Amino acid sequence: MYRQDHVFVVLCAVLLAGQVTAVPAGTGINPHSPPLGPFESVRFASQTQSQIASSRGPFTWLRDTVIERIWGIDKKHSNKVGSQPRPEKSWSRYGSDIVLRMEVHSTEEVEALADAVNILFLDVWDSNENYVDIRMAKEVVPSLLGLLPQSLQKSHTLLIEDLSKAIYESRYPTRDYQRHTIDQTDCHTVPRPLDVADLFFDHYQPFNVILQWMRLIVSMFPSHAQLVNVGVTHEGRDIPAFRLGVRSRDDEQEGPRKTIMIVGGSHAREWISTSTVAYIAFQLVTEFGNSVAITKLLEDFDWVLVPTINPDGYVYSWDMDRLWRKNRQPTGLPFCPGIDLDRSWGYEWDGQGTRANPCSESYAGNNPFDSIETRTIAEWAYNQTQDKRTDFIGFLDLHSYSQQILYPYSYSCSTVPPTLENLEELAFGIAKAIRMTNQEAYAVKSACEGVVTTDKGNGQRVSANVESTGGSALDWFYHQLHAKYSYQIKLRDKGMYGFLLPPEHIVPTGREIFNSVLVLGHFLLGEDANALEWEFIPGSKSTSEQENGSSRTFDRLFFNMNEDELEKPGNDRDYSSVVEEDVYQDEGWGLW
């Protein structure tokens, strides 16, 4: 702990004492890059109600009027959904926006909702087999309901009543500079003493601060931390990553290095994913040499951690639009830039449905790997394997929200992954680690099951989805690079805050996911892990603290499951023999 305290005293002095600067397009991760330009803060605008109404624009007004005239929507649907007073300073683009949760029960309802979303250009926040969360202006609610079947017109609840106010409060919380923990039973906060090691994670950080922090970390721990560039963005920014690990002098003769890759920030607005990747990296770096288990994990494996694979979008979400999702690459429509990075990967790309609609939040581009970010990251990862330096055995793609642990495949439920049994067993182990940290429940399911499924009566299950599901990073790393322990983890919460998760959730979320990473490492080490002493980071209300007040007891409680519940990696079915289309046997890339 002394080591972490010392690190953060230096971090605070370096990062907080200087002027905050922005990372302009084209700036690399080289510590000797030219001086950075001034940070341009977000502008707020006070609005009257008439200004809010007019800010929707003539196109929105015309669209709603035409829809109401064609479908004859009853004015009774124009209920008041938001009545809270607007803060003095707010985000004008979301002046009257709300978030609704539509409860769905059949394929027909999902298909009708998907059509309405496309017609009205709505923003889907989350969707699964039970509900769909949608952001819209409250003036659009009657238009939406008029497009839906009768069964859906009353099957909705209000999640966020005043989105602009929620955005403002998430950026500028009115609370003392004292750490709070989350009361998991009623979502209230209870004060606890400030931990110096949590200072950097007390708030979300802009990209320029994250980059300076990464440079500082590798300069302080050069023996086991490197800063590498895994790709480039449309605006010319490098995509920085930590590469953690300790290689022996005989590394050249040892063959490819087993590597786990953890990424966040595919969708720019999912700030908690970026902070969580940074938290995991910090714990691995600073506990090397202190923790026997973590030292072993960095000696046996390389860890590539990318806080955000979408720096352009992340910067834009800070400077201009907090809820921006895609990258910033131009499309066929000048006023609708951006490609959804998690729909742009080459394996089972299915972007035909959104090809004609660049304004869609799930726009996958015109072709597989149309986004510069996914293409350059794929090239980097593939080249690492071709140089016989890297063998990707694990991949974690962090997102928000909904608290789910998803395993391949995303594109279809009709294809069974060849390592399904071990994928499920490890996923349940990860979920157990999270639950024992903070009592947070994470569901475990196939990534394709975020849809409505119905039984036609003949045993055939039919599925429908509000968004396309192909072209995911999860499927590409699992199938193309054979990273056989690949997961997409959707972090907190379950909809109360959505993408606007308050900063007091950063550390609790980081702790529970870091404990999940320890479970992954324990699993990958196999029998060698049993001889090590494993120490979890206790949560605010961990099982160990409640029952025994001991983190060691918590470790034993969890890892007792390995002998009876978790299979060792050596028990896998032969992966390469199951995957017939081995990309490494193709001429050239064979990846696109």
Swiss-Prot record:
State the encoding gene.
ecm14
Q: Where is the signal peptide?
A: 1-22
User: What is the protein name stated in its UniProt record?
Assistant: Inactive metallocarboxypeptidase ecm14
| Single GO BP term | cell wall organization
Propeptide residues according to the Swiss-Prot or TrEMBL record: 23-175
- Assigned keywords, A-Z: Cell wall biogenesis/degradation, Disulfide bond, Glycoprotein, Metal-binding, Secreted, Signal, Vacuole, Zinc
Where Zn(2+) is bound, by residue? H267, E270, H399
For this chain's record, the cofactor binding note is: Binds 1 zinc ion per subunit.
Q: Which GO terms describe its cellular component?
A: extracellular region; vacuole
Q: Which PANTHER family match?
A: INACTIVE METALLOCARBOXYPEPTIDASE ECM14, PROTEASE FAMILY M14 CARBOXYPEPTIDASE A,B
Q: Name the needed cofactors.
A: Zn(2+)
Q: Which residues bind substrate?
A: H267, A268, R269, E270, R325, D342, R343, S400, Y401
Function recorded in the entry: Inactive carboxypeptidase that may play a role in cell wall organization and biogenesis.
Q: Which organism is it from?
A: Talaromyces stipitatus (strain ATCC 10500 / CBS 375.48 / QM 6759 / NRRL 1006) (Penicillium stipitatum)
InterPro entries from the entry? Peptidase_M14
The yes or no answer to whether the keyword Zinc is present is yes
